[in-house]
Amino acid sequence: VCGDSYISTAHVLWLEDSGLEVIPIPYDTDRFEWYFNQINGLYLPSGGAFASTQKSYYNCCKTFLQLAVAANNAGNYFPVWGGCMGMQQMMIIADGRDDIENFLETFDSMHNLCLPLIFTDKGLKSKLMKNAYESDPSFLINLMTTDVSLNNHSMGVSREKFTRSKLLNRTYDIISYNYDRNGKQSGSH
């Protein structure tokens, strides 16, 4: 939360239940290489440290993403997962302009808006969703027909803005999207 460094217990338990060991990294660290060499994946959580108000958090995310891209480009698999605000950080960084004050837009998705996922064609063909469908078709159908996606954020990236950003489009594909209470479309995060 702006000015503090914490990880929600729910996030830690979720990661540990998946068999992962959690190593917290302070967002104000200057030991990026040291931490990077201690981990084999990166999770950028949701929370309250927005890029426009917490530059040190943004710079930490940017440095670790650059290290992850370099590792992957060198053939060393290094996964990165961004949840909600973490995904927002990843999109701002991938856009390449560091426009942390203006890149995100407001959405009316606060206060536990639960929705089904609307998959794009690329999303349905993605490795993540294709494998899920092949192992359990009812799982994917459930994601598309049941209110399973918790939307509890006021900021995001519209599908239109995502489409206009050439660098962002080269880096990521929208797998699914949702509409907020006012009908504004954003990529699911």
Where are these regions (language model features)?
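N-terminal beta1-alpha1 cap of cysteine-dependent amidohydrolase-like domains
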Residues: 1-188
